[in-house]
């Protein structure tokens, strides 16, 4: 995880009046969650499940997916770095401007990274550059808030079967525009969809709170 991410209140001893360094939604009533955690506090005396299979199975049932298609991670950040590591050395395009962690993770794992500032049009056959094998898209985007229309994105994915699309929907609860559901994304064999509970529920310190679902092979 890169330095300078923000929300680093642990560095300061004085009270913080206003925090503009993070886009976590702060007006969430966490009283029920805190009460639940208090009832489970005795669990700190035991090791947790080595792999979060129980939670993954629960999320899979919720999204009507096979359990092996869901991967729970320590925030979306871990999912980003694990994805970059799994596909190390890939020719990667990142839709810009966007969250800098995608490029950091990819460069750490030897990706050949290029920036993409516009999407191909119908007149171009919706084709991405020939050398691209992985595309990262934050949708809705951080920091611009723009949303790529679901219909266009589906067309783009269909016309580029050689590309693995990593779509980060961490901000999906901050828009009324239609986005891919897990079931819709699962119809494509080349999509990896990232979800995060951090932003909506304001729990960045509670891990794991993010999960990924995928339908593509990893070899």
Model feature map: region roles:
Residues 212-218:
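Conserved small/polar residues in nucleotide/adenosyl-binding loops
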Residues 1-47, 131:
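N-terminal "arm"/small-domain region of PLP-dependent enzymes with the aminotransferase-like
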Residues 18-20, 93, 114, 166, ...:
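Hydrophobic/aromatic beta-strand patches that form the interior of the parallel beta-sheet core
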Residues 85-139, 143:
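PLP-dependent aminotransferase-like
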């Amino acid at each position: 995880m890169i330095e300078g991410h923000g929300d680093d209140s642990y560095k300061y001893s004085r009270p913080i009046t206003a925090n503009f360094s993070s886009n976590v939604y702060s007006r969430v009533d966490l009283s029920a969650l805190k009460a639940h955690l208090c009832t489970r506090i005795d669990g700190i005396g035991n090791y947790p499940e080595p792999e979060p299979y129980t939670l993954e199975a629960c999320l899979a049932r919720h999204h009507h997916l096979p359990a092996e298609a869901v991967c729970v991670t320590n925030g979306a950040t871990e999912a980003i770095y694990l994805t970059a590591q799994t596909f190390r050395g890939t020719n990667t395009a990142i839709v810009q401007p966007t969250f800098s962690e995608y490029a950091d993770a990819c460069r750490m794992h030897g990706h050949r990274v290029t920036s993409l500032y516009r999407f191909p049009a119908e007149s171009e056959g919706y084709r991405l550059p020939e050398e691209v094998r992985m595309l990262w898209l934050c949708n809705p985007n951080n920091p611009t808030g723009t949303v790529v229309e679901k219909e266009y994105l589906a067309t783009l994915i269909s016309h580029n079967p050689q590309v693995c699309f990593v779509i980060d929907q961490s901000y999906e609860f901050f828009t009324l525009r239609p986005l891919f559901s897990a079931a819709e994304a699962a119809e494509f064999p080349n999509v990896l969809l990232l979800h995060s509970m951090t932003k909506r529920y304001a729990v960045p310190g509670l891990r794991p709170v993010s999960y990924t679902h995928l339908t593509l092979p990893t070899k």
